[in-house]
Amino acid sequence: MSQEIAAIFDIDGTIFRDSLLLHHMEKCIAYDVFPISVEMELKPHKNAWQNRELDYDDYLYTASRLYTKYISNKNTLDVEFVAKKVIEKESKKLYRYTRDRIKWHKEQEHKIIFISGSPDFLVSKMAEKLGADLWFASQYLNDGNKYSGEVI
């Protein structure tokens, strides 16, 4: 019986230097997919986190709630377009150590698995870009044309 070896990496903060969801939210605002008011709603929480008055998890929780609210009824093609832009730009901003470990595991023919709480349409693109064999992420449900605002 042969055994396969797998290396499991969390994307947000372990491979990538930040949260894919946060970068996608910023780009959705920049591309007018989300209204600018999202930034204003999040700003007090971001400032509180940056001033160490709020835990990062609380800041990220607020950001993800706003993200889920504003992705509802958005066109999947618009969201995907912005997702591609995020991955094109941000996929190079990786921790060197983690990038080297992924490379080493690939050379050893180990399976590479990515996990993330970020949206599946971002994680799948990052996984493809970095050659992961399998990935798990938050699923943002849609009907093929528009996002429902439901996450599993």
Regions found by a protein language model. Name each.
Residues L21-H23, A127:
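Single-residue recognition of alpha-helix boundary sites
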Residues H24-Y31:
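Short, surface-exposed, low-complexity cationic segments
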Residues L20-L21, V33-W104:
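A metal-dependent, Asp-based hydrolase signature
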Residues D10-I11, L66, W135, K146:
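Residue-level signal for pocket-adjacent positions within structured domains
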Residues Q3-L21:
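Asp-based phosphoryl-transfer active-site loop
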Residues S2-I5, F81-V82, I87-I152:
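C-terminal cap/substrate-recognition subdomain and adjoining C-terminal extension
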Residues I11, K69, I113:
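Short, flexible active-site loop motifs that bind/organize anionic cofactors or intermediates
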